[in-house]
Regions:
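Noncatalytic alpha-helical scaffold of FAD-dependent oxidoreductases
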Residues: 1-259, 264-428
Length: 428
């Protein structure tokens, strides 16, 4: 593990940890290393699933580690949520943002070698469905790194802060980790949309707000009919989405072309034809509901499945207040949606897992804390550790097992028998 600082082990180097339990620094000596004469910054954009793209991290690191003349100076990762938050401008001519970006710095005293290595890195990305762009000048290289410097933008939509917990994952398991985080995100997203359905069901069960004046008078019978149709729509969509959430590991059967459902999961037909009992017929490639949602073969969409249908149902000036109220409900509930965003110091497997939260929303904070617990378990289940560059502090203490804490307590007795170094820290 690249940045595992458990028991002072940092890639084999003895070290101190962030909690301030190891001693008092009275002096320090800094060693400056000469920067190699030539460098390249490579930006890699991946538009497929993160699971398929993530092995490129290991392949690029292995290639650079084995190169006799080129050093890997930086390897950073941003996921789709970060790219959206920073307003990432896609370098590829494609019309969509990538699902994953890698930013790589390589350096060498041999200009030819560093240029060839940059091209080889792009080829490695191409083999994983990625596209690559190479910056040579100092100005262009700096521009490539600007998006990485704006990662705090992930919390811009909340009024408070982000929970930022780091873990260390074995590089070969990064794909499994990103899949695990995506599953958490899908569950949180669907749960938030079910909350919206419940709010809409309550709204349509009550008298509806109508715009009535000298120019507009709503027909009571027509209003009652539309109200019943809206209630049925919300109930059907809620049932469909709840089925997804309850059956993420079940086989998913996409609709046949004859059924009229789109491959992208648009419209109600695609979702309604999801099969929980089989893999879609003889010869079909098994696909789980989770994988279909992750790869956007099917979507859970407020805009397409509810909002668009409601706008088609409530056509007319007299119904504008109804549609405005639905949009307000959506906006209010969306503010409380919890999601997890990732960026990594990918070269050493140090993953920063960020969850933006509103400090005045207790339920949101509880949901975020539950997500953190799942993330810590995911990391350790994959052979990783929770003691990365952020250390343990206070928030991770509950996730350390008794044996680990007992080992630290024994160490502390030896180096600090009088408890002068941050007394009581990391002690239960």
């Amino acid at each position: 593990l690249g940045k595992d600082v458990t028991d002072k082990f940092l890639a084999g180097l003895p070290g101190i940890q962030k909690e301030g339990c190891d001693g008092l620094i009275t002096s320090a000596r800094f060693i400056l290393h000469r920067l190699p004469a030539h460098g390249r910054t490579v930006c890699l954009e991946f538009f497929g699933s993160a699971r398929e793209a993530t092995p490129a991290i290991v392949e690029i690191k292995d290639y650079c580690d084995a190169h006799p003349d080129v050093l890997l100076a930086g390897l950073e990762h941003l996921d789709a949520r970060y790219l959206k938050a920073v307003g990432y401008a896609t370098k590829s001519p494609r019309a969509t943002r990538p699902n994953m970006v890698l930013l790589i710095d390589i350096v060498s005293d041999d200009e030819t070698a560093v240029g060839v290595a940059a091209s080889k890195i792009v080829q490695l990305a191409n083999a994983r469905g990625g596209e690559g762009f190479i910056a040579v000048s100092a100005e262009t290289r700096k521009k490539f790194w600007l998006d990485r410097a704006r990662t705090a933008a992930i919390a811009a939509h909340t009024n408070a802060f982000k929970i930022n917990e780091d873990v260390v994952i074995p590089l070969p398991r990064l794909g499994d980790y990103t899949d695990g985080i995506e599953r958490i995100n899908i569950e949180l997203s669907i749960a938030n949309k079910l909350k919206l359905c419940d709010a809409l069901a309550g709204f349509f069960a009550a008298p509806l707000p109508l715009l009535e004046d000298d120019d507009t008078v709503a027909d009571p019978a027509q209003v009652a009919e539309k109200q019943a149709q809206a209630q049925a729509l919300v109930a059907a969509v809620r049932e469909r989405w709840a089925n997804y959430l309850a059956n993420l590991d079940a086989p998913f059967a996409p609709p046949s072309p004859a059924s009229g459902g789109g491959a992208g999961g648009e419209g109600r037909d695609t979702v309604a034809r999801a099969s929980w009992g089989g893999a879609g017929g003889e010869g079909a490639v098994p696909l789980t509901v989770f994988a279909a949602l992750r790869d956007k073969q099917v979507r859970v969409s407020w805009k397409r499945e509810l909002r668009r249908e409601l706008h088609q149902l409530f056509v007319g000036r007299e119904y504008t207040r109804i549609l405005e109220a639905c949009d307000r409900l959506h906006g209010e509930i969306l503010k409380s949606r919890v999601f997890v965003a990732l960026h990594m110091h990918a070269g050493d497997g140090n993953v920063h897992t960020n969850i933006p939260v509103n400090s005045d929303d207790y339920a949101m904070l509880q949901t975020a804390n539950a997500a953190v617990a799942r993330i810590m378990k995911l990391a350790t289940d994959l052979g990783g550790v929770i003691s990365g560059e952020h250390g343990i502090g206070l928030t991770k203490l509950e996730f350390l097992d008794d044996a680990t804490l007992a080992s630290f307590a024994e160490y502390k007795k030896k180096v600090d028998p009088h408890g002068r170094f941050n007394k009581g820290k990391l002690m239960r």
